[in-house]
């Protein structure tokens, strides 16, 4: 720790501890920031001794400055720390990191202007971003810039082999040789399972290439051989051979484009592995906006490796079929084959807060609105409500509970004592008659035979079918079922009277209050 913190002298260390990390902040720089900066320099292949002088810090800033706009947070923090150390070596008084950055950038710009025009870094000409450039009539290989490699690694880490990785690889690997493509693949640290899938695809495609392009035979001395599958993959060929195959005058072989196509096949398999959702399973939720559903649908469609005609059919059929019922009702009203713009415009407000508010208002209105009563039913209810009859005195206008007349004793139906109206024996019999002891009736009807009445018609003779005139008609035979019913009813009446006799008098006294008030009621 002592050796690493010795990049600054004691006086400069005191000055470092006075510099604030942020303008107006409380935290200040200390020795642990110097130690962290030394460890970060090792990752960029820079020696820690460069921090001991102003010129060394200038070299570090020259390397880091182009990477700051697209760099990570650690890179930006390292650049800020080196700017502060640079200002301390240059004996510039700074209060915080922002002042140190401004002074360091001003010095870098001044040093760039002092450089001669021939050695000053300039932007490459049109097409200069390609790894292979033509200089003085010769094709020269230029290594990939760290910015390109950083963009590729960030794409893989952020998208996690989503559908965007394939077009991103196509854009970043344009014009690359197999050597450059292998360099891009080697930069991917994580996702080694996906890298292994890509290697297997490369081996399969290389074997197919060797079968389709056999070796023609011995070649004359000095003639360039034709590329094999391993040569296209960059394992058995050099960069110079790859450039010659790509740009020779006779029978050029675009080994870079062929290798890119193999990598794209492997990336497409990785996309399907990392995104197992089938497009048939993409359905709109009941409250999901239509635009969000369309975004998910086309993202899944982009990952599908099918024919364009099949994708067109999926767009025209599944997009409307898998929408929720509200959007589907609107989309079917647009006619045949509506455009995507028309569908988005028509379903713009469905599923949003506006539609929810309208549905809530309609439901609340229906709940608060009373159900209409028909006019005839209302009149009938009003007529019934006006004709209230008292069971005690028989008058109209009040109920038995409100009646002031003396309470009528006995049955309210027949007026007899000893029973109540619900147990009145003179109540009307049903279709199957009255059952014994107040239970349900039996499965035979009860026939009432009047006593003392002589039939007007003579009985029929079963043999002749008619009774002779002048003969006295005999009484009809007694029905055993009627006799059994009568006996059951008599037995039931006796049992009810025996059960009600102990508390009959107490019940009548409680009903009429004769024991308390006597005749004054």
From Swiss-Prot:
The modification Phosphoserine is found at residue 145. GO terms for cellular component: host cell nucleus; host cell plasma membrane; host multivesicular body; membrane; viral nucleocapsid; virion membrane. Residues 12-19 are annotated as: Interaction with host AP3D1. The keyword Membrane applies. Residues 8-43 are annotated as: Interaction with host CALM1. GO terms for biological process: viral budding via host ESCRT complex; viral translational frameshifting. Late-budding domains (L domains) are short sequence motifs essential for viral particle budding. They recruit proteins of the host ESCRT machinery (Endosomal Sorting Complex Required for Transport) or ESCRT-associated proteins. p6-gag contains one L domains: a PTAP/PSAP motif, which interacts with the UEV domain of TSG101. This is Gag polyprotein. It comes from Human immunodeficiency virus type 2 subtype B (isolate UC1).
């Amino acid at each position: 720790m002592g050796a690493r913190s010795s990049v600054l002298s004691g006086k400069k260390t005191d000055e470092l501890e006075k510099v604030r990390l942020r303008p107006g902040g409380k935290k200040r720089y200390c020795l642990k920031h110097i130690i962290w900066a030394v460890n970060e320099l090792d990752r960029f292949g820079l020696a820690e001794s460069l921090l001991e002088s102003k010129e060394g810090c200038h070299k570090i800033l020259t390397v880091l400055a182009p990477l700051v706009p697209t760099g990570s947070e650690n890179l930006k923090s390292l650049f800020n720390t080196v700017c502060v150390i640079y200002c301390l070596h240059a004996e510039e008084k700074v209060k915080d990191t922002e002042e140190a950055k401004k002074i360091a950038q001003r010095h870098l710009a001044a040093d760039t202007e002092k450089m001669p025009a021939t050695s000053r870094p300039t932007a490459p000409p049109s097409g200069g971003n390609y790894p292979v450039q033509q200089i003085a009539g010769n094709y020269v290989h230029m290594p990939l810039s760290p910015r390109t490699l950083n963009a590729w690694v960030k794409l893989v880490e952020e998208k996690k082999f989503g559908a965007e990785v394939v077009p991103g690889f196509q854009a970043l690997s344009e014009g690359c040789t197999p050597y450059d493509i292998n360099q891009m693949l080697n930069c991917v640290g994580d996702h080694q399972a996906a890298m292994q899938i890509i290697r297997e695809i490369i081996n399969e495609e290389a074997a197919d290439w060797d079968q389709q392009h056999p070796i023609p035979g011995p070649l004359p001395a000095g003639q360039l051989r034709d590329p094999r599958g391993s040569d296209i993959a960059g394992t058995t060929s050099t960069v110079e051979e790859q450039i010659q195959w790509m740009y020779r005058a006779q029978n050029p072989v675009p080994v870079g484009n062929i290798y890119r196509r193999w990598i794209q096949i492997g990336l497409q398999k990785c996309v399907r592995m990392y995104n197992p959702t089938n497009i048939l399973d993409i359905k709109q939720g009941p409250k999901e906006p239509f635009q969000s559903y369309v975004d998910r649908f086309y993202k899944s469609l982009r990952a599908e490796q099918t024919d364009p005609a099949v994708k067109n059919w999926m767009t025209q059929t599944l997009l409307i079929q898998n929408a929720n019922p509200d959007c589907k009702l609107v989309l079917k009203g647009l006619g045949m084959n509506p455009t995507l713009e028309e569908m988005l415009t028509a379903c713009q407000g469905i599923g949003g807060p506006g539609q929810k508010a309208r549905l809530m208002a309609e439901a609340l209105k229906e709940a608060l609105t009373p159900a209409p009563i028909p006019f005839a039913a209302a009149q009938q209810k009003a007529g019934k409500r006006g004709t209230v009859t008292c069971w005690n005195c028989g008058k109209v206008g009040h109920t038995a509970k409100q009646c002031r007349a003396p309470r009528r004793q006995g049955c309210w139906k027949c007026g007899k004592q000893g029973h109540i109206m619900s147990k009145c024996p003179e109540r009307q019999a049903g279709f199957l008659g009255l059952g014994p002891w107040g239970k349900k009736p039996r499965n035979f009807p009860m026939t009432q035979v009047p006593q003392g009445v002589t039939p007007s018609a003579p009985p029929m003779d079963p043999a002749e079918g008619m009774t002779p005139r002048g003969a006295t008609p005999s009484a009809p035979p007694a029905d055993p079922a009627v006799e059994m019913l009568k006996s059951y009813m008599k037995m039931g009446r006796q049992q009810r009277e025996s059960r009600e006799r102990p508390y009959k008098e107490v019940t009548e006294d409680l009903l009429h209050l004769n024991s308390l008030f006597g005749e004054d009621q």
